[in-house]
């Protein structure tokens, strides 16, 4: 995934880039390939990356520290489900998008309607998901 081709690198609409520019996005991702790939995509959108957090302990520390506008959260981090972390994000009013490479049929009802991006994702999918978060929650 680290060497992207034109099918993955979609052009970024200038207005969308401006809307996301400077937004601090927490990345919770345990894959040593997907984490940096996601950070690269966010950089192309003008976002500042917090993380990537490769495990739950690092993710909890970053969430407790705050200082980000939204999060991209992999549903499974080293075999752990991330829902306790999501509770922390929700308590802080931080909007987030789930990412997953699995069909995850056992999603708790509370989180079923949460925005989600299926791996492997593209720049366009990440852009759309983040813009959706900020349109839903303009204060963030």
Each language-model region and where it sits:
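Two-component/phosphorelay signaling modules centered on CheY-like receiver
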Residues: 32-51
């Amino acid at each position: 995934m680290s060497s992207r081709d034109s099918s993955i690198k979609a052009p970024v609409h200038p207005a969308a880039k401006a809307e996301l520019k400077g937004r601090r996005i927490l990345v919770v991702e345990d894959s040593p390939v997907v984490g940096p790939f996601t950070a690269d995509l966010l950089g192309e959108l003008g976002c500042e990356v917090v993380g990537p957090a490769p495990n739950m302990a690092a993710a909890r520390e970053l969430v407790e520290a705050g200082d980000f506008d939204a999060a991209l959260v992999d549903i499974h981090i080293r075999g752990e489900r991330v829902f306790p972390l999501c509770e922390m994000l929700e308590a802080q009013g931080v909007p987030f998008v789930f990412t997953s490479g699995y069909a995850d049929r056992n999603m708790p009802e509370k989180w079923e309607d949460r925005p989600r991006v299926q791996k492997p994702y593209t720049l366009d999918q990440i852009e759309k998901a983040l813009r959706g978060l900020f349109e839903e929650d303009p204060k963030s």
